[in-house]
């Protein structure tokens, strides 16, 4: 089965809602399982539970069929997203434009390559969909 991973902020920002809406559309179109991911940064000291994340998503979109909710802890959002995508065997990762910029900066530091989508496709063997902010 196709696997879609979408990282979001909690509480859901406007851009996270737009990114999540696109991920839900892709998952429904592909008959895919959707993993909604939030990353708790150690340095922020905040803890979000999976039930809080699920409740926020369902308040905005209603029940999402075939959805899984994950919360990871880490120092870097990018690293946690890569780990979740690899662990889930993601076929598609849907990220917001702001996240793409952060990923791009991280990749430049690591491999001096500004093409984050090509990097992720190579590393994760998946499609990357970037949702522009409106």
Region spans (language model):
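Small/aliphatic-rich secondary-structure junction motif
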Residues: 2-47
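Charged helix-capping and loop-helix junction motifs
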Residues: 20, 50-54, 109-116
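Active-site phosphate/pyrophosphate- and oxyanion-stabilizing loops and adjacent acidic/basic residues
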Residues: 24, 82, 118
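General small-molecule cofactor/ligand-binding pocket signal
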Residues: 35-37, 68-72, 129-131
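Short, surface-exposed acidic-centric catalytic microdomains
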Residues: 42-59
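Mid-chain, well-packed structural core segment of small domains
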Residues: 61-100
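Gly/Ser-rich helix-loop-strand patches that form or flank binding pockets
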Residues: 92-134
